[in-house]
Design a protein with these regions (language model features):
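Alpha-helical recognition domains of nuclear gene-regulatory proteins
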Residues: 97-98, 153, 178, 215, ...
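Membrane-interface recognition of transmembrane alpha-helix starts
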Residues: 79-115
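Extended, low-complexity, polar regulatory segments
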Residues: 2-88
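Conserved, structured regulatory domains from eukaryotic proteins
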Residues: 203, 211-237, 244, 286-315, ...
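A cross-family acyltransferase "interaction/gating" segment
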Residues: 210-218, 248-251, 258, 262-341, ...
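Catalytic core of membrane glycerolipid acyltransferases/transacylases, capturing the structured
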Residues: 116-150, 156-158, 171-229
Length: 561
């Protein structure tokens, strides 16, 4: 086929629609004709120092603001939605918002103040260094218990009246570390205050939080100093020292996943809890409630909405199950990752959920994709795995398609047959159909070529600096890198992250277009920003973001209907 035109064809995915021109029609609607007969973007304009700058470009790439595709069904542990379909339950929420919510808020505040008061008394005359050196004893330990009881009342006031305990808790000598999963919410800390408070691992900044900081200090946490380049090793050493100490330290609680998930699968455990090589006790958290109004994930409701919905239920339940102590084998003592993997398998089996190849690092990738306006950031990791399976990471086909993109037609409505031809991949390859389904968010049997190219180039270049990524996208927006018009320049800079909004991008264009010729070169843009300290973020490499390994284990999937 030629590269000058993409012809629509009937395909197995075209059952529900034969044509989808939403994106192209939007492109046309975003232009209007000025007094000189020139087509320009229809926008609202503001005047800055005598220069007219549009405040809001109407044009949006149709899929850049879509967080996750619904075209392919698989387990994504970082996406959560609340579905309340009953009109009675909705009415109950609004009624309790008036009648019960204010009382609960007052109860939470009073309980929190009581906990702070007990912590203040218990910490009187004790420095933070002393708290880190030796476990507290005597009357201070009694006040520590009272602080935990007061914090438990915070949750009771907030609707968590019941905690059902299963299994037998181990003593600190039997299992110095408690490995807790799944970690899905701020509510998970209810486990920490449900009895004699164990130690936690927390950021050093939490010690300075008003009210809560003093309460957290009283739990004698292991603080992580993020500004310290040796923070990881220091934290591991502190955990090892406590677990092997002869002092009467309380157990250390570690949420091994390292981030919140939706409990549909257990993601990779971080190995920090397993480096000491001591026995651990796995602890499971469950929330057997009608509605899940407290799961707080990367893509889901915000914390205020979750608090509101949680506190407007009559009550919520939490279930804590202590599994038998897991004693590591010599091989597991020598390999913390193997130890973490095997403990995760035991916990997943007890929870009756699968394990997933997702990890905390994937949240970093998805967050970066969202900042850079990449389509479907919630699916970008799965898209990345699929591209790797198709062998497209080592291919330059996406760059070739970028170079000819503006000369192609119907790029917003590419069917599966054309998609296979463009990528030069066998139409029968199941990974191709998976990739197509991930991009087919409209369920109309077509995908956007631009969305694919943005995703593909992001996955390949996510470790590079932003300026390199932007350079690779030029041909998606402008025929030439030497003559980039203002509207195309602004669209291109949408992918520079959240620090460059439309007004800043347009102001930057006018600063570069000193001769008022109506276009600039990308090289001029790069040279200008490289000298300005305010644009250093464009040249920062994200080397901590991992690349998938060929033949690596893929994320758990479920069959799509």
């Amino acid at each position: 086929m030629t590269t000058s035109s993409i012809k629509r064809r009937r395909s197995p995915h075209d059952a529900r629609a034969s044509n989808d021109g939403d994106g192209l029609q939007q492109e046309e609607n975003d232009y209007e004709t000025d007094s000189n007969g020139t087509r320009v973007l229809a926008t609202d304009a503001i005047d800055v120092n005598g220069v007219t700058i549009t405040a809001n470009l109407g044009k949006r790439d149709s899929e850049e603001d879509s967080w996750a595709s619904k075209g392919y069904s698989y387990i994504n542990p970082f996406v959560h939605r609340i579905q309340i379909d009953s009109h009675i339950d909705v009415a109950k929420i609004y009624v309790l918002s008036v009648l019960l919510l204010p009382i609960r808020v007052v109860g939470c505040v009073l309980s929190l103040l009581s906990a702070w008061m007990f912590a203040y008394i218990g910490l009187y005359g004790v420095s933070l260094e002393q708290l880190q050196a030796k476990p507290i004893t005597g009357w201070r330990r009694c006040f520590q218990y009272l602080t935990a009881r007061a914090m438990r009342m915070v949750y009771t006031s907030g609707s968590f009246h019941y905690i059902n305990f299963k299994g037998t808790p181990a003593t600190p000598k039997e299992a110095p570390i408690l490995v807790v999963a799944p970690h899905s919410s701020y509510v998970d800390s209810i486990f920490v205050v449900s009895g004699h408070p164990p130690s936690i691992v927390a950021k050093r900044e939490t010690a300075d939080i008003p009210l809560l900081g003093r309460i957290i200090n009283y739990a004698q946490p292991i603080y992580v100093q993020r500004e310290d380049p040796n923070s990881r090793q220091t934290t591991i050493r502190q955990i090892v020292d406590r677990t092997r100490s002869n002092d009467n330290w309380q157990q250390v609680v570690i949420f091994a996943e390292g981030t919140c998930t939706n409990r549909t699968a257990l993601i990779k455990f971080k190995p920090g809890a397993f480096y000491p090589g001591v026995p651990v006790q796995p602890v499971l958290l469950r929330y057997p409630n009608k509605y899940d109004t407290f799961t707080w994930t990367w893509d889901g409701p915000g914390v205020l909405r979750l608090l509101w919905l949680t506190m407007t239920q009559f009550y919520n339940r939490c279930e804590v199950e202590y599994l038998p102590v897991y004693t590591p084998s010599p091989a597991e003592v020598a390999d913390a990752n193997l130890y973490a993997h095997n403990v995760r398998e035991v916990m997943a089996k007890a929870l009756n959920v699968p394990t997933s190849d997702y990890s905390f690092e994937d949240v970093i990738v998805m967050s970066r994709a969202r900042e850079m306006k990449i389509p479907f950031p919630g699916d970008i990791v799965e898209i990345e795995h699929t591209l790797d399976s198709l062998g497209l990471f080592d291919s330059k086909r996406d760059m070739e398609l970028c170079d000819s993109f503006l000369s192609l037609s119907n790029t917003d409505t590419v069917d599966i047959i054309t998609f296979a031809e463009l990528l030069q991949v066998d139409l029968q390859n199941p990974e191709l159909h998976k990739l197509f389904a991930l991009l087919n968010h409209r369920h109309k049997g077509t995908v956007s070529l631009k969305s694919f190219l943005l995703c593909s180039l992001f996955c390949k270049l996510k470790n590079c600096d932003i300026i390199t990524f932007l350079r690779s996208l030029i041909k998606l927006y402008s025929p030439s890198s030497q003559q980039i018009e203002r509207q195309n320049f602004v669209r291109l800079l949408r992918h520079a992250g959240g620090k460059l909004n439309e007004q800043k991008a347009q102001a930057l264009f006018f600063a570069l277009d000193v001769d008022n010729v109506g276009h600039i070169s990308f090289d001029a843009f790069a040279q200008y920003t490289e000298k300005q300290t305010s644009y250093k973020f464009l040249y920062h490499k994200s080397e901590h973001i991992r690349r998938p390994k060929t033949n690596a284990a893929k994320t758990t999937t479920v069959t799509s209907n």
